[in-house]
Swiss-Prot record:
Highest taxon above the source species: Eukaryota
Pfam families: p450
TM stretches of this protein: 1-21
Involved pathway(s): Secondary metabolite biosynthesis; terpenoid biosynthesis
PANTHER family tied to this protein: CYTOCHROME P450 98A9 (PTHR47944), TRIMETHYLTRIDECATETRAENE SYNTHASE (PTHR47944:SF3)
Keywords from the UniProt entry: Heme, Iron, Membrane, Metal-binding, Monooxygenase, Oxidoreductase, Transmembrane, Transmembrane helix
EC id: 1.14.14.58
Name of the protein this chain belongs to: Trimethyltridecatetraene synthase
GO molecular function list: 4,8,12-trimethyltrideca-1,3,7,11-tetraene synthase activity; heme binding; iron ion binding; terpene synthase activity
GO biological process: response to herbivore; terpenoid biosynthetic process
Gene3D superfamilies, per database record: Cytochrome P450 (1.10.630.10)
Organism of origin: Zea mays (Maize)
Catalyses which reaction(s): (6E,10E)-geranyllinalool + reduced [NADPH--hemoprotein reductase] + O2 = (3E,7E)-4,8,12-trimethyltrideca 1,3,7,11-tetraene + but-3-en-2-one + oxidized [NADPH--hemoprotein reductase] + 2 H2O + H(+)
Length: 554
């Protein structure tokens, strides 16, 4: 039987079964938000699998049907919020009703049975995870404790670019992604394991992360939306997820075993290099919490942190932290190269505040309003997760007079909201950091979930718990790249020639990697650390030369 005939049979059976089982006259019709009519079985999935990325396709549909829109996506109702007002209703007014996550293969397979941070359903385990993130993993104290690590990796990134000077253009994302991955690995799993980056094992892990982002972000995975076809795994997505999980599980098991051995050495009074409490990373914190849970009888099984939970947490931290920061920095540099006057303004601010005798530190960031505006404007135009992570309606809810049935998928199109003329009347599609400066319309707008016209990290209960760390990584990254190098496009390339096409997945990165020329503009010893570093007035970052040199290998 041909594939076309098989599909026709499936469609026919589906239509007959729906007709027979439909509750005609037995229930009150739902007052659903307006939206497009879909096809049998697939609903409006075809509109999301076309040439346009899903967030752009949904924005075009919302322009016709309204800011609160209903679609039938496979077997599910889906409601899409595409304005600041409707986002406020979904993420604040009815936050609790939509605080759940849909059950997906990514959560079941890739997140060790929903044991991570991102895909965890609303309930006791999620409350434990949220508290853990707020008080242990991403608290201000914990984030600040890794400031030295972040500064060292920023110097290493600058050194890598410095060594490329005079050799022509560089692929920006390759350098930034390498530094970001090492940074996150050092914070999450320790110096020893971050050192594998560039080795065959490290390269395999990086490729695994890239493939995981591609496969878990596939909107066209039919089994996710039509569960009764899921067992067929038509596109092989679940099979790929299982293979990827096996690969990174081996890596994580080695890491956890190594941390167990470190703890044993401490208990026996024979600590080795890197075994002190000052060298503890996030895995050390998580394993300590596993032990505490085991010794606490009141901890229920539903909220207990386990070894698999530790691996799921680490995977979410490493994958999410690396991808989001690197992608955002590359978009920021792309926009600056397309607007040379904005690049000059950013450089002038850095020269005025920092000078040419030292690098930018995180303590300097509050004094760099234009750099902050560049980052906000980049996140407005290029949110890494343009539809956020889908929400799941825990109960039937009425939103703006419309019914949202229990079990519906709820999406917030933050990409459309950030380009909505109602919220951004001044050229919403243009890159204008000035809109966030004092005296401008966006001066008071922040990215931390209080202003619904700008939601790169979401808002409410399911807001990204690592937004504070992400802002430090991205803002310091952009500041040091602009401060340390004079950037220009390759010869013969004009600003308008820079492609801004997107590649949609779990994150939305550039389809064409940014290539540019980076010319050092600071004294050479700042890149090579050949002279003893000096204590920076007002900064706790000193002696950055203790970081072992490495080369970014791709």
């Amino acid at each position: 039987m041909s594939a076309a005939v098989a599909l026709a049979v499936i469609l026919a059976v589906y239509v007959v079964l729906r007709y027979i089982s439909s509750p005609r006259g037995r229930s009150k019709p739902l007052n659903l938000p307006p939206g497009p009519r879909g096809w049998p079985v697939i609903g409006s999935l075809g509109a999301l699998a076309g040439a346009l990325p899903p967030h752009r396709a949904l924005a075009a549909l919302a322009a016709r049907h309204g800011p609160l829109m209903h679609l039938r996506l496979g077997s599910y109702h889906a409601v899409v919020a595409s304005s600041a007002d409707t986002a406020r209703l979904v993420l604040k007014v009815h936050d609790l009703a939509f605080a759940d996550r849909p059950r997906t293969a990514a959560g079941e397979v890739a997140s060790y049975g929903y044991l991570g941070i991102v895909h965890t359903p609303y309930g006791a385990y999620w409350r434990m995870a949220r508290k853990l993130c707020a008080t242990e993993l991403f608290s201000a104290r914990r984030v600040d404790s890794f400031e030295r690590v972040r500064a060292q990796e920023m110097r290493a990134l600058a050194r890598g670019l410095f060594e490329c000077a005079g050799r022509g253009a560089v692929a920006v994302r390759e350098h930034v992604a390498g530094a970001t991955l090492r940074n996150i690995l050092r914070m999450a799993v320790g110096e020893k394991w971050s050192g594998c980056y560039g080795s065959p094992e490290g390269e395999a892990f990086r490729r695994t992360l890239d493939e995981a982002f591609a496969v878990t972000g596939a909107v066209s995975n039919v089994g996710e939306w039509v569960p009764w076809l899921g067992w067929l795994d038509l596109q092989g997505c679940v099979r790929r997820m299982k293979r990827l999980r096996a690969q990174y599980d081996r890596f994580f098991e080695q890491i956890l075993d190594d941390h167990d051995h470190k703890k044993t050495r401490r208990e026996r009074g024979r600590p080795g290099a890197g075994d002190s409490a000052a060298d503890d990373d996030l895995v050390d914190v998580l394993l300590r919490l596993v032990e505490e849970d085991e010794d606490r009888p009141e901890t229920t099984e539903a909220s207990r942190l386990t070894r698999d939970g530790v691996k799921a947490f680490v995977q979410d931290i490493v994958a999410g932290g690396t991808e989001s920061s690197a992608v955002t920095i590359e978009w920021a540099m792309s926009e600056l190269l397309r607007r040379p006057d904005a690049l000059r303004a950013a450089t002038a601010e850095l020269d005025r505040v920092i000078g040419h005798g030292r690098w930018v530190t995180e303590r300097d960031l509050p004094d760099l309003p234009y750099i902050d505006a560049v980052v906000k404007e980049t996140m407005r135009l290029h949110p890494v997760g343009p539809l956020l992570v889908p929400h799941h309606a825990r109960e039937h809810t009425v939103v703006a007079g419309y019914d949202v049935p229990a079990g519906a998928r709820v999406l917030v199109n933050v990409w459309a909201i950030a380009r909505d003329p109602a919220s951004w009347p001044d050229a919403p599609d243009a890159f204008r950091p000035e809109r966030f400066l004092n005296g401008s319309s966006g001066a008071s707008v922040d990215v931390r979930g209080a202003h619904f016209e700008l939601l790169p990290f979401g808002a409410g209960r399911r807001m990204c718990p690592a937004h504070g760390l992400a802002m430090k990584l991205v803002t310091a990254g952009v500041a040091n790249l602009v401060h340390g190098f004079a950037w220009r496009l390759p010869d013969g390339m004009a600003p308008e020639d820079v492609s801004m096409e997107e590649l949609f997945g779990l994150s939305t990165r550039r389809k064409v990697p940014l290539v540019a020329v980076a010319e050092p503009r600071l004294p050479a010893h700042l890149y090579t650390n050949v002279t003893p570093p000096q204590q920076v007035a007002g900064s706790t970052i000193a002696n950055l030369s203790t970081r072992p040199e490495y080369k970014l290998v791709f």
